[in-house]
């Protein structure tokens, strides 16, 4: 029973397939297409296995192609030479020119490229558009549509730079004046051969002169204010008044008397100066409680190191000797070096070391 049903189904399927094949043959004969040509194309499979038989038949049939849509474009009204615009009907071939162009891509077609290649390279003042460029030339070509920087920002930056230069020049002038004053003061001390005001023991003549001068000043000024700080010595000296002349004469007389006392008692000045220097050293020693109180606030500086662990030393740039920054740094170094020479650790400053390293000791063989 099953075999009989199967045979009936196979006969129906074969009859239907034969009917379909007969219909296809009749259609091909009606259109004048030989069946041998279709079988040859099907066996070769020029278009692969995905090529459908409907496409093959449609290609072989003498059918008229469908009309393609044409997009009509209005030519440019402000164009200088409208005859050179080329075809105004775009197609898919124009996509490459549009994608590779950055300026006015909607006004350029593929036909313009050939025309630009044929023309001689010349500049026309009324030429509005240029031909398409290659990608290499386009990368090297500077952009024309870059927005300029705001003028207000440029003006602010220029004003800040001018103000900074003015401040640097002022600081350099102040430091120069201070160096000049220090040099003149050092020359004055060298001429006297001793620091003024230290270890002087006035004689009887000097005391009499001082008493006379005090009485004269008290008659002129009834209440004398506390002595002011010594002013800085400037290069331009004011005109001397009679009071200044009298004071200078008294100072010269006191200097002569003190020199005589020094010749008679040479050890007195040394003892007084040593006593004063000891007092100054004791006052300069800081209190350890104040130092230890701020130990928790100390922050170490991060040091850049190489992969091997050695610290990296930055190269010192060579500055001009007239640079304000170099002048200021040089003056500060001289100032702090002068202070370190007068410090109580003068005998221990024989080497230069970091504040975290221990002093090097010389090894003596026994």
UniProtKB/Swiss-Prot annotation:
Swiss-Prot/TrEMBL GO biological process terms: aerobic respiration; mitochondrial fission
Name this protein carries in UniProt: Mitochondrial fission regulator 2
Residue numbers bearing the Phosphoserine modification: 306, 343
Domain of life, source organism: Eukaryota
Region annotation (Disordered) ranges: 191-240, 255-281, 305-324, 345-366
Sequence similarity: Belongs to the MTFR1 family.
Keywords carried by this UniProt record: Coiled coil, Mitochondrion, Phosphoprotein
UniProt subcellular location: Mitochondrion
């Amino acid at each position: 029973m099953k075999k009989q049903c199967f045979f009936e189904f196979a006969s129906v399927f074969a009859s239907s397939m034969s009917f379909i094949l007969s219909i296809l043959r009749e259609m091909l004969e009606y259109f004048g297409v030989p069946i041998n040509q279709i079988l040859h194309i099907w066996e070769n499979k020029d278009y692969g296995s995905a090529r459908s038989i409907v496409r093959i038949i449609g290609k072989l049939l003498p059918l008229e192609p469908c009309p393609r849509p044409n997009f009509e474009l209005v030519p440019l009204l402000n164009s200088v030479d409208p005859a050179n615009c080329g075809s105004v009907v775009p197609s898919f071939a124009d996509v490459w020119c549009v994608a590779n162009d950055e300026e006015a891509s909607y006004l350029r077609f593929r036909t313009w490229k050939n025309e630009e290649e044929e023309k001689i390279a010349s500049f026309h003042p009324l030429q509005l558009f240029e031909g398409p460029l290659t990608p290499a030339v386009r990368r090297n070509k500077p952009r024309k549509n870059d927005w300029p920087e705001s003028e207000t920002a440029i003006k602010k930056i220029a004003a800040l730079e001018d103000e900074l230069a003015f401040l640097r020049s002022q600081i350099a002038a102040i430091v120069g004046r201070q160096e000049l004053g220090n040099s003149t003061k050092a020359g004055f001390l060298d001429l006297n051969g001793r620091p003024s005001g230290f270890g002087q023991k006035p004689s009887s003549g000097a005391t009499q002169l001082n008493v006379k001068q005090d009485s004269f000043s008290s008659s002129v000024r009834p209440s004398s204010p506390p002595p002011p700080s010594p002013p800085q010595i400037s290069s331009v000296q004011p005109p001397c008044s009679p009071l200044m002349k009298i004071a200078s004469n008294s100072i010269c007389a006191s200097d002569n008397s003190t020199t005589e006392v020094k010749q008679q008692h040479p050890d007195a000045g040394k003892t007084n100066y040593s006593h004063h220097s000891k007092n100054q050293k004791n006052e300069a020693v800081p209190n350890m409680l104040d130092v230890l109180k701020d130990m928790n606030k100390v922050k170490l500086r991060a040091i850049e190191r190489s992969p091997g662990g050695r610290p990296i030393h930055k190269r010192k740039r060579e500055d001009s000797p007239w640079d304000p920054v170099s002048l200021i740094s040089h003056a500060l170094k001289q100032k702090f070096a002068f202070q370190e020479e007068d410090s109580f650790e003068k005998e221990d400053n024989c080497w230069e070391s970091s504040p975290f390293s221990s002093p090097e000791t010389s090894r003596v063989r026994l």
